[in-house]
């Protein structure tokens, strides 16, 4: 493998055996591609904004005399960039401008004669834009739109599994689900009649819908039944015979033909009899007259002479009717062929319960069901039925729906109309009847072929369409009303409903979620999340076990591991690593094609629908060098089941071993050795890891760390290759390679880094450069590390030296004992940034004022404020300190005449003010790192705001000037080379000022042209600089657009450094979580023979019952990796020559059985080897991919290479006594995470505070400054101890005895520690409740 200069700094040793056929795809593509489809111009008009416009426009007036047509749309440029939107608290969006055409037709002239056409561009609101990382900035906060897994439109056949009716009879049903429009259900009842429901209303006999489509009884019977024809000849009855139809019946008479008896009376007719009859071509037999009684006629029979109906279609025949038919000359009678086995008489039976007999009565019946209480008219009834399923405005199956519908009914074509046809409805009924008759199977609704993904773009399009439909009504009204000659398109359109619909979706939809920004992994996982909840999806309460369960079709599409614990389990899933959606929105996963028994590198993406038919081998199947299967029998998947197949039968093979799992689960090394429940916890807890002060790459990883770090967007990645020309903490400048430049540009890329910014979860986002001056970089190299990344690899925690042993009960029940060294080295120290805002409003009594002049506040409290009343940057503040001084006008108090007089004389302040300053919340302390002031337009800016503005202007100017200088330098370097090539001497040039270079003339015409082009570029560059500076200045100095009634907002940012402490929650990556019980002095920790103490002591009893053995293997492999690092470190310290280092490192990389990674250090320069060694001395990072990881043998070999015992266990000594522990202990390196459940955030104590209104008990929870609930069980505990007085005060004065508690408070203030319990308020509530039941309960006095 070829490594770039940056990648050579640290190479992770890979233990994977299977070759990587397919690189991990870009992990955010599901979000970005979907939104791109939504906003890009689509000439086909299949999806996105274009489709929404085309589906609503043209809008015609009611009279048809005019229409508003859609021409095209364009998105403008956003006003602010992403960072500015976040600071200002506004939405990152672009204005949508639509070109519309108003066409007015002549009234009197023939149809379609145009009188007037007006075209105009109309503003239609703002469309939020997606940032490069797949998020939206809505009102200044980053949000993610989660994809939804919903039931695909189409037709589904299902059964109630015998649960509905007491008899346990299985009732079948069919449901046609459109993309939008009314649902149509067909269902059988226990009597086997077929019913229809529209939109889950009350049911009607299914034949009503056929009658409404203008079918007569006879036509209905023709559609669903085969015929049996009886003929009357010479008073004898003959029947046309189809032998197959007799199968399984018992002969009620001798079946004979041509004098030969085939079946005797009373015998069961078998397949042998049928073959005999078919062989002799018997197609007509004589039957006794009684046989026809009870058969059902297939059409109306009319007496030719009188014209009266002898028997109507669907009537049962009797011998009397037969005689009348015979008399009136009907010699052949058509009857319906039915039997109990596989040709039920369902439709015939349903027709008997159907109260309607013609189209009108059927339409009226449907109208009554849909609109009960309204009087039906013919027109209304017809319109309603037409609009239900046959109107493109009201009903749409969508392309997906039509495809699924046609597939379900085994039709050839997959495309067709979005509305239903008569044939569609009849075919669904036929298939349902076939299923009831035992032919065909019901669908599995949890199959991923029946559930599809709705991503951002599609949901936004639907919302946008909703807005357009609201506008459509208004436009129709306007087109019909007024004087069209004076109106323009923009007078027709009101953009409010559209922006409201879009805003509501992005701001408050259930699927628009506040981004989880704990660390890069939680961001990526959130964007790849797939939820079954949300509008048009399931609800938590109603979702059963089946929907939540893992389904065979999840393989390679949805992760079986990563899902939340709790009520949402199984409803919220994560996309698998390689999964993607196809054009229809179904999830597909890649497979390698097997051609003629050879596994090729050709990749096919298959959806769950297509996958079932193939035989698919697993990724770890053994192949030889040519790609043939080694074994004869191979474990494969087929139709969702695993079984053994011959190697010739295999058609596809998995792409990778980690294909099954999601990104989160693919980061757990040795996942294959962990129990599923613990792996689930591990995957979920990695997302809660807080970025530590110094990121530390995991010694034992899986090889996915780089992909996650780069794709998450927290790192700064090189867009083009080049050389690092300048680097400092806040910017990196790259001089781009010649071959990657665009013609006519300076060839400089500038990357500005994010410094100490607050994330959504109050953690710290900070980027640090990881390249040095003069280093070559290639496209895609990581230039700067973000939070939780280390040299471009994800680094969520720290590598800790752990020992598995009990230690004085301090690690009882998953507690964790930590060494003080961990605190001293700041291994788990994290920075948290809080934003506190102070809003100054315009009140009825006057404006609130931000000032340092606050009533009744001492000097000390104001010591940290400047003259504007705002805290200065760098101040150390603690709970209760004032950050922003603010006073609010108080209502006029009634003054006494004397006061009025004094006021009149001395002209004191007319009204009073009260202190409403922004203070630091209790329990919070930190350093002020930034202050921002936003002032409304037209309100005078205070001194601090002007200072901030001045500083921002200076910074902007400095940044832009530096940028210009860098670009100029690049440009003049090129000008110089052109001039020198044109024959001008370098010495002369360097004596001239640079600006004069452009005035020089060259003899060579081509060179002169180049020079002129460069001069033009120089002018453009300066003009661009002025323009940028102007725009920046305007943005900084303009007033801010604040909410109504708000004059000023001051935002103060506090940074808090939190060290690890007892009560904090920590975890490994295998679901092994615990709480820190004690921070132990270094000298008391167990140490080994070299005197190295361990950092963390874990309880060995936490492993066996939980079956997450992965952590033990990780510990051993971590030890080996560290051992190799230690040896490299020793060699570096002894300053051994590079050749020895090269040899040892090469040996380490080569270790392992047939691993796929080939690192050839002979291609590295000495300098590169030394730098690699420097980066490896803390431990050699190792990748052990999921399901393809290091084997036990390889771990032992690596331990041996690091001169460590192959058992992975060493002798430890007790730090307090120096005695040896009696047996060896497993010691190694485990990657530990500090989770965002910090004791500082949870610690809370209540003195006195707010009480609940009714019960008068203290509120609960930290946010309400509440108390701890002393519940039922706690009361039992005190009762068991007989602690009567403690119990009494718990239930009275400490809770809801109102008088008692006030008296007690007074007593404590007076220094008198006595209490008198009274009547608890909750007892009074109980009395009231009993009285409300009509029982008068009274307390008797003594």
From Swiss-Prot:
Gene3D superfamilies: 2.40.50.100, 2.40.50.150, 3.90.1100.10, DNA-directed RNA polymerase, beta subunit, external 1 domain, DNA-directed RNA polymerase, subunit 2, domain 6, RNA polymerase alpha subunit dimerisation domain, RNA polymerase Rpb2, domain 2
EC numbers, comma separated: 2.7.7.6
CDD domains with a match to the protein in the record: RNA_pol_B_RPB2
Keyword Lipid biosynthesis part of the UniProt annotation: no
Any single Pfam family the record assigns to this protein: RNA_pol_Rpb2_3
UniProtKB keywords: DNA-directed RNA polymerase, Nucleotidyltransferase, Transcription, Transferase
Reactions accelerated catalytically: RNA(n) + a ribonucleoside 5'-triphosphate = RNA(n+1) + diphosphate
Assigned GO CC terms: DNA-directed RNA polymerase complex
Subunit structure: The RNAP catalytic core consists of 2 alpha, 1 beta, 1 beta' and 1 omega subunit. When a sigma factor is associated with the core the holoenzyme is formed, which can initiate transcription.
Family according to the record: Belongs to the RNA polymerase beta chain family.
Described function: DNA-dependent RNA polymerase catalyzes the transcription of DNA into RNA using the four ribonucleoside triphosphates as substrates.
Protein name, UniProt field: DNA-directed RNA polymerase subunit beta
